[in-house]
Each structure stands twice: as C-alpha cells, then as structure tokens.
Amino acid sequence: MSLSLDGVDLVHADGQRALADIRLRLAAGERVALIGPSGAGKTSLLRVLASQWRPSAGRVELLGEEPWALSAAARQRLRARIGLVHQAPPLPPRQRVVSAVLAGRLGQWPLWKSLVSLVYPLDRAGAHDALQRLDLGDKLFQRCDQLSGGQLQRVGIARVLYQRAELILADEPVSAMDPVLAGHTLALLNREAAARGSTLLASLHAVDLALQHFPRVIGLRAGRIAFDLPAGEVDRAALDALYANEQLQAERASPAGEPAVMHIPRC
C-alpha cells in the first residue's frame, strides 16, 4: 500500500474545516486524478499527504510509515521519497534551471554533495535528460525568471522525474499550459510513473484531462469524498452532483428546441 488515510479531518486555526472523515487507499503504482470545485479541499488533502500539514484527527500512512509517529529526521527522509509538483513551482527567480531540477535529489544526497551541487551542478547530464523528456533540453542554463508559467510547471515535473520519487503528488500541474501541451504533459507523467512503478495522485480542474489520462478518479466536495470510481464509470450524474452550483453552466436551448447541455469548464 502506497498511502492510506483513515478518518482524516483537517481543521484550520480559524475553525474552518478543510477535510472531513477522509478514507482513502492507493496501492503502489496506482495513478489517480483528484477533481472537484474550487475550495473543495484538494490542495489541503495533498498537503496532508505530503506531511506538510498534520491532520486534526485520523491516521495517515505513507510508503509504509506513519509520518507523525516518526522523529523529525526520519520524517524528512520519508519526504525525500515523495515528489511534489506545485501549481506555481517555488523556484528562486535567479536560479538556473539545471539547479532547479537537481534540487529534486537534495534530500537523498549527503550534505557535502548537496552543497557542492548548489554552486556547481554535479549531474548536468541527468538534469538534461529529465528536461529533454519535457522538450526543455535547451533551457538547461536559463534562469527561472526567463521562463513562462507553463515552462516553469514542466521544470517542476522534470525535477520530480529526476528525483525518482516513489509517490508523486501533483497540485494542478498543467494549469498554465494550453490544452494540447497539457494533454501531452499528463500523458508523459503517466507513462513515466507507470514505467517506474511510482504512485501518482494529481489534482486537476480540467475534468476532461482527468477522465482521459487517469484510470481512477476521486471527486472531492466540501472536504469530503463524493465518489471514488474508475474513470469509465464517472457519469454525468456524478459530475452534476460534484459541481452543482459551482462550475456547471447550462446552454440555452437552441431555436429548434434542443435540450440544454451541461458543460464543465476546463478551469
């Protein structure tokens, strides 16, 4: 089992409940999409799984370990096995892309190697290979502030590929990309995860991409799991309920009297 959550709640300091009674299991190597309206708790769930936030109640197990039962040092070693892809990657503007990618293994390297690599990138070939998979091989020595939002997101994905993470948690990893590039990038991420046996959980606003690229889809609404289904079983009724009064918009009937059709915006 790659991850397991039993009865997980998350209540913020202001009393707002972000997650309620989350029960979830992902086997090693599974690839799962997480969808739901804005504010549903998708990012909160990913932060709990990354052991960035401690749940208010319930049990969390990641890669065979209970993170909050570990010492701080052991928890840091666990985090080094987890790859995070951010919607807006936290990359220093003046940092070179090669250093941003190599940072994926800083938690796995000895301290001396990590420090040296920050000054003089030690594995340029490895960084280039990861970037080349995302058509960014020519950006190896560019500064991060010279890249577009979509390019920065792909650098973040390249860093996780270089890291060889056992568990990949991706929060809106393609939100800054056009539809075609987003599809290509998700297909690549899925192929790489499958080839390496990595577990992949990605939150997405674009429902069409979730259904197209992931075998299993989880719908989250108001901090609770609304459904957990194979992609082929996610029907219109499930999506209508998930996005009720949130993102679904009905087209007016055509002059010929055709019924209204419900559309889910990509973002």
From Swiss-Prot:
<dbReference type="InterPro" id="IPR017871">
    <property type="entry name" value="ABC_transporter-like_CS"/>
</dbReference>
<keyword id="KW-0472">Membrane</keyword>
<dbReference type="InterPro" id="IPR027417">
    <property type="entry name" value="P-loop_NTPase"/>
</dbReference>
<dbReference type="InterPro" id="IPR003593">
    <property type="entry name" value="AAA+_ATPase"/>
</dbReference>
<feature type="binding site">
    <location>
        <begin position="36"/>
        <end position="43"/>
    </location>
    <ligand>
        <name>ATP</name>
    </ligand>
</feature>
<dbReference type="GO" id="GO:0005886">
    <property type="term" value="C:plasma membrane"/>
</dbReference>
<comment type="subunit">
    <text>The complex is composed of two ATP-binding proteins (PhnC), two transmembrane proteins (PhnE) and a solute-binding protein (PhnD).</text>
</comment>
<keyword id="KW-0547">Nucleotide-binding</keyword>
<keyword id="KW-0813">Transport</keyword>
<dbReference type="GO" id="GO:0015416">
    <property type="term" value="F:ABC-type phosphonate transporter activity"/>
</dbReference>
<comment type="function">
    <text>Part of the ABC transporter complex PhnCDE involved in phosphonates import. Responsible for energy coupling to the transport system.</text>
</comment>
<dbReference type="Pfam" id="PF00005">
    <property type="entry name" value="ABC_tran"/>
</dbReference>
<keyword id="KW-0918">Phosphonate transport</keyword>
<feature type="domain" description="ABC transporter">
    <location>
        <begin position="3"/>
        <end position="247"/>
    </location>
</feature>
<keyword id="KW-0067">ATP-binding</keyword>
<dbReference type="GO" id="GO:0005524">
    <property type="term" value="F:ATP binding"/>
</dbReference>
<dbReference type="InterPro" id="IPR050086">
    <property type="entry name" value="MetN_ABC_transporter-like"/>
</dbReference>
<comment type="similarity">
    <text>Belongs to the ABC transporter superfamily. Phosphonates importer (TC 3.A.1.9.1) family.</text>
</comment>
<dbReference type="InterPro" id="IPR003439">
    <property type="entry name" value="ABC_transporter-like_ATP-bd"/>
</dbReference>
<keyword id="KW-1278">Translocase</keyword>
<dbReference type="GO" id="GO:0016887">
    <property type="term" value="F:ATP hydrolysis activity"/>
</dbReference>
<keyword id="KW-1003">Cell membrane</keyword>
<keyword id="KW-0997">Cell inner membrane</keyword>
<protein>
    <recommendedName>
        <fullName>Phosphonates import ATP-binding protein PhnC 1</fullName>
        <ecNumber>7.3.2.2</ecNumber>
    </recommendedName>
</protein>
